[in-house]
Amino acid sequence: MSNTPDQPMVPSSQVPESVVVFELDGTEVTVTDDGLTLLEALRGPLGVHSVKDGCAPQGQCGCCTVLVDGTARVACVTPLRRVSGRSVTTFDGLDSAVRSEWATAFVDHGASQCGFCSPGIVVRLEALRTKAAVSPAGADGLRDGAVERALAAHLCRCTGWQSIVDAATEVLGGSGAEVAVELHGPNDSSRDLDAAARRATLELGAPQVIGADVVAGAVGFSADTAPDGCLVAVVDPDGSWVLGESVVAARRAAGKVQGRRTTVDPVPPLEVPDGDWDLTLRTGWVDAAYVETDAAWCEPGGEPSRAAANGGAFGAKRHSPLPKVAQDLANEHGRAVLALWSREDCSRSAPKRPPIAAGIRADGTGVLRVVATDGIVEKIAAVAPGVEVIEVEVAGPPTSVTLRAAGWAEAVVLIAGIGAPSDVVSVEPATGISPERVVVRTTDGAVAAASVTAAGIVVHVQAGAALD
């Protein structure tokens, strides 16, 4: 069921309509403001798509970071009226040479994967460079840990921090990676970005491209590429789809205030089975926490766009319902429709890792209770054949084995933690020169080894020949 776009709008605030004038990427712009955030204005009437909506209005993911008079700000919690008469710079407004420099460094170091969070990260790091340049010490004014502190305002679930830190170190200077690596930029003739994309696609199990456009966030995300003039569909508090002529109009028609805090305690839903166990483990409803929220658009009679434009989502979007929703609504209303989930919608409705509660003995036998999920028993048995797996029906969010290593990783933790014999997991004891190592071998031949030292956690991965 869906509501039509001509229903009376429910205003989200009592702010009277006014006009806000400010400088955007070097050009003066005028926007009618009736309580908009800066992000809503940028992505709406101003059409700036390098600024992403990953969590609005939580102000936590950093994907909407812009410069306001040179200072990094998250646009989703900045009222539009606050930038009146000021200068706003997005990723698109950075000098082309600066954008190219960052793109080269990010591609060099593998600091982007899907690219959704990259433009906002680059903007904040560029603000860090500007801040250092005006300090008395110049570039040397970047103190140790400055990049890491800047990144604390961002969530990137794909690459891990180190590759981003290394890219920033290359651009900003300072202490970089401990091991020197010969790197080549995206325009280097020795690079094969198509091969890199094939490798990334193999690793992710979903199509992915590699290149400068990824760093710019310009890889065809559905929320960015929907046709001009399309209807926007969002979910109301009752779970029905409500349509409007824009994201703001649809959300106001839905009458739903986006949440910023949960009221649910993170308590694992299953109890550990009775028994005399050497090791136990309980997990809750673990969300994949991908930053690009589910979105898909479709023309009447056409095929919908993909919910995951450039990999990402850790397998959680493999069966996203939004492409089918967009297709059905487009056919129903005879217009292109963009179906859009908010961060809250993803948290409520996207699939989670199946929660488990398990006990295991030193010989590798035990009992593992898991929320009933198609295919989960086979995933766990492949790692822990001596563990009895019991599926339990539990009310809660959807679960799926398509999430990266769902069930499999939890079983690995149990087997490795107890040191039980396994064809998948082995524990190599410490020697005089090497710490204890846990080695994991997948069924398709990949090998990973991890050890804990005083300096940190050391991980080695062998996953086939590097294609690029």
What are these regions (language model features)?
Residues 2-3, 7-9, 15-33, 48-49, ...:
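Cofactor-binding beta-sheet edge motifs in enzyme active sites
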Residues 59-60, 73, 119-124, 316:
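Short glycine/serine/threonine-rich phosphate/pyrophosphate-binding segments
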